[in-house]
Amino acid sequence: WIVEPCAMMNRRSAICLALGGLAGIQGCRKREDGAAKTDAVISPAGSEPPARKDMEGNSLVPVTVDPEQVIRTIGGLRPFRSSGFVVRRDELGGKTLVHNYGHGGGGITLSWGSAHLAVEMAGEVSGKECAVVGGGVMGLSTARLLQLHGAKVTIYTSDLPPNTTSNVAGAQWWPFSVFDDNRRTDAFAQQYVAAAKYSYEYFQRLGGPRWGVKWLPNYYLSQGPPKNGWIAGPGGVLRDLQVGLHDFGPGEHVFPAPYARRFHTMMIEPSVYLAELLAEVQAAGARVEIRKFVDGN
C-alpha cells in the first residue's frame, strides 16, 4: 500500500496512490481477537455499504500491512536539480566528456532516453575506447548503448548492483519529480520530452520476467477533480504515454478520496532489472573497475 503526497507537477498538492496492483483499500484490518476483518470499505462511521462490482478498483486485493513483515529499512538520495537533469558535452584534456546526471525521481524512468542523448552527443564512437563513470542505472544504460554503437567500454564505479542508489528506487515508469516547473527552459523541455519518449519505447522491449518489467494500473487520488499540467493529462506533452487514462468521480471507485485518475504504465523491479542489465553489459565485453573519483582530474 503506497500512499504519498503527489500530483503530476506538485507532489504535495494531492494524494497519490501508486502501484495499482498493490492498491490499499480501507477495510482490511485485524480484529482484537486476531481474526482478519475484510469488509470492503469502511467509512469513519462504519455505515458505508460494500463496494459495487462495477466500481473501479473493486477487483484489487488489499495488501497485508504488518510491521512484523518488515525485514529492513533503506533509503536513497535522489539527485534532484530544480532546473532538471544535465546532458552536456565538454572537452577536457584532449578528451570528450559528456555529462549525464541529476535525474531526481526519474532516474530509472529516463535512463534509456537520457543515455541516448549522451551517446548521440558523444558523436562517432565505433571502435573507440569509452569510459563510463558510475555503475547505477544511468551508467549501465549508457554503457549498453555505447556498446550497441560499437564502442569498447570500461565502467569505473565505487559500487555495482545490488549496492547502488538505483536499487532502492520505486521504479514506477513515470518521469515525475525531475525539475521545478518554474525553472523549466525550452532547451531542457526538449531534452526531457525526447528522453521520456525514447525511454518509454525502449522499456517496452524489455517486458517480462527476465527483466522484471510489467504493466500495472496506477491510481492518483485527489480531493478535487484531477488537475492537468504541462506533463500529464489532456494537453500534456506526455499525454500519449498515459495508456488508458481515465478519471473517476465520487461513487465511481473504491478508493478513500473523492476523485481518482487511472492510467497504465510499467513497473520495473530494480533488483531483477539491474542484475540483468549488468550481466548483459558484461557479456558484451565491458570491463569494470571498482574505483572512486574524488575530483575532475
What are these regions (language model features)?
Residues G57-V125:
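C-terminal catalytic lobe of FAD-dependent flavoproteins
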Residues V288-N297:
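A conserved short coil-to-beta-strand element within the FAD-binding core of flavoproteins
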Residues H149-T165:
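Glycine-rich FAD pyrophosphate-binding loop
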Residues C130-A151:
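N-terminal Rossmann-like FAD-binding beta1-loop-alpha1 element of flavoenzymes
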Residues G75-G94, S166-V168, E201-A284:
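Flavin (FAD/FMN) cofactor-binding and adjacent substrate-gating region
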Residues C6-G21:
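N-terminal secretory signal peptides and thylakoid transit peptides that target proteins
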Residues G106-L110, A187-K197, R261-E276:
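Short beta-strand to alpha-helix junction loop
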Residues L160-A195, G244, F248-E252:
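Glycine-rich active-site loop/strand segments that organize a redox cofactor
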